[in-house]
A protein has these predicted regions:
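GST-like domain detector, emphasizing the conserved glutathione-binding G-site
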Residues: 1-134, 139-143, 147
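A generic membrane alpha-helix/interface feature
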Residues: 43, 117, 164-165, 170
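GST superfamily/GST-like fold recognition
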Residues: 143-169
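Conserved small/polar residues in nucleotide/adenosyl-binding loops
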Residues: 171-175
Length: 175
């Protein structure tokens, strides 16, 4: 395979990238990394020492949304970002908002060093954000309407892990 994804099997950010690669029907290799005993080369490839990391020949990318946008541009079918620049910019803004409003709390829950108090606050914040999001998406097939998009991919791994995180199970929020 020409692409290698360094990934944590339970890491929601890695799962986003796996999702996109499978959605594109790509030939790629997954190298699962033990998130608590990372090999040294992870720090060489990503100065933040985090997965996912995508390697394709001389290109090394990290940060799930950046990796996924690259894959989407490189292999345009099926297209996961809107073709229109205005809609694409709106989608990027929504992805950014998801990171700031929801996924910063996911980082807290994924981090073993987080205090119990921080975890409780993170769970509440995630619950509040998803509850706020629910009415907007309740009548749509996907987050952006009828089209499956990068936003669905960004959010899906969180929804899969809600029970694990100890947040309320959102039976009405189906992806």
């Amino acid at each position: 395979p020409m692409m290698v994804l360094y990934s944590g099997s339970t890491d929601p950010f890695s799962q986003r990238c796996r999702f996109v690669l499978f959605e594109k029907g790509m030939d790629f290799e997954i190298r699962d990394i033990d998130l608590y005993h990372k090999p040294e080369d992870i720090n060489v490839m990503n100065p933040y020492g985090e997965v996912p990391i995508l390697v394709e020949r001389d290109l090394v990318l990290y940060e799930s949304n950046i990796i996924n946008e690259y894959i989407d541009e490189r292999f345009p079918h099926p297209q996961l970002m809107p073709p229109d620049p205005v809609e694409r910019a709106r989608t990027r803004l929504l992805l950014f908002n998801l990171e700031r409003e929801i996924f910063k709390h996911v980082h807290t829950l994924e981090n073993r060093a987080s205090s119990d108090e921080a975890r409780v606050k993170a769970r509440e914040a995630i619950r509040d954000q998803l509850t706020g999001l629910a009415p907007a998406v309740a009548k749509k097939k996907y987050l952006m309407g009828d089209e499956f998009s990068m936003l669905d991919i960004a959010l899906a791994p969180l929804l899969w892990r809600l029970n694990y995180y100890g947040t309320v199970s959102y039976t009405h929020l189906t992806l």
